[in-house]
Amino acid sequence: KFNEIRPDREYYIKAENCAYLTKEYRVKGGEVENKKFEIAPKIIQTKPGDDLVKLLNISIYFDLDKFFIHEDAEVEMAKVIEILKMYPNLKIDIRSHTDSRQSEAYNLRLSNFRANSTRDYLIKNGIAKDRLTCKGYGESKLLNDCNDGIPCTREQHQLNRRSEFIIIE
């Protein structure tokens, strides 16, 4: 939130977004109101099989036994949405996962709920349904050794409760 902009002062403005090149400006307060600031889109090189999570250096995690998009993840989801809007021909496969702390059947069901919830969130935010496929993988693709019976921290388990956005076209 800004207070009054003083015309005699110099201000520093930084425009930053995952889909655009960061741009910085120095302007006098009196010039801000009618000044146009332009930022250029990033050119992201993608190919089928790439994961938007890795390309954007973000994380989409879920709470234990939950499938809704957590408030913290909404910021990261906005970055995925921005890329999908910039590249309207991009199609992705949403792959959702769980940790290993329940039965395999339970985790497979939960991961399918996560995948569907993630897809529905994207659709609700303007991404066409025909650009999205989704599937839950349960605990079958853990990122670490936190398998059944292995003692792990909450943080280690958290790494496995995730969604990936794999480019398919």
Residue ranges with predicted function:
Residues 95-169:
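Periplasmic OmpA-like peptidoglycan-binding domain that tethers envelope proteins to the cell wall
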